[in-house]
Design a protein with these regions (language model features):
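Short amphipathic alpha-helix that is part of the acyltransferase structural core
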Residues: 1-35, 51-53
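Conserved catalytic-core motifs of GNAT/GCN5-like acyltransferases
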Residues: 127-157
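A conserved beta-strand-loop-helix scaffold within acyl/acetyltransferase catalytic domains
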Residues: 29-49, 53-54, 58-80
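Conserved small/polar residues in nucleotide/adenosyl-binding loops
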Residues: 172-178
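Conserved active-site tyrosine of GNAT-family acetyltransferases
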Residues: 123-125, 172
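Conserved acetyl-CoA-binding loop-helix of GNAT-fold acetyltransferases
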Residues: 80, 86-101
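Conserved GNAT acetyl-CoA-binding A-motif
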Residues: 102-115
Length: 179
């Protein structure tokens, strides 16, 4: 299993990743925003994604989004193909995405939103803390990404204060002593 920073050569997996995210949303019955293959391809092409491959078979994926002129970094679209679940792969992918975020945006507030129990567990194990949505980016472009989620009406009705998702933030890198 190889977990690596995605490059242009990995764009061939964008459609498969998009379908995997869609299928996961259907199976779970909870909200997951849809990501088009074209959108995922831009993340891959820009080096703002991590892909896991077993030989040449897609196994998992996650990407980085930057908001507020680099003040916020979101980890989004974490997905593991069904045949690779239950092996700790999601946590390994998330760690790699975290390392890339630290390398590129060392002072950014790193966050994510999820309805998934598995992602919540991973985030907790990696030191993320649950927070109110007011502690996340106020960039309207970020919140537009939620429009394809079936729970978007909740988010809009509450003026982005509440949803079924839980926001989590990692503060660990912001409190490390400088040497």
């Amino acid at each position: 299993m190889n977990i690596l920073r995605a490059k242009a050569e990995h764009i061939i997996y964008a459609k498969q990743i998009s379908l995997c995210i869609d299928e996961s949303a259907k199976v779970r019955g909870t909200g997951i925003a849809r990501r088009t293959p074209e959108y995922l391809a831009t993340k891959i092409e820009n080096g703002n994604a991590v892909i896991a491959l077993d030989e040449n078979q897609f196994a998992g994926f996650c990407y980085i989004e930057v908001w507020g002129h680099g003040k916020y970094v979101a980890h989004s679209g974490l997905i593991v193909a069904p045949e690779f679940r239950g092996r700790g792969l999601a946590k390994k992918i998330k760690k790699e995405v975290f390392n890339i975020s630290l390398e590129q945006y060392p002072k950014a507030k790193i966050f994510g939103i999820t309805t998934g129990q598995a992602v919540m567990k991973i985030n907790y194990e990696l030191g993320y803390k649950p927070v109110h949505f007011s502690e996340l980016t106020d960039d309207p472009e970020f919140w537009k990404g939620c429009q394809t989620c079936k729970n978007f009406d909740i988010l809009t009705r509450t003026e982005r204060k509440l949803c079924l998702c839980t926001g989590t933030v990692s503060y660990t890198h912001l409190t490390l002593p400088t040497t």
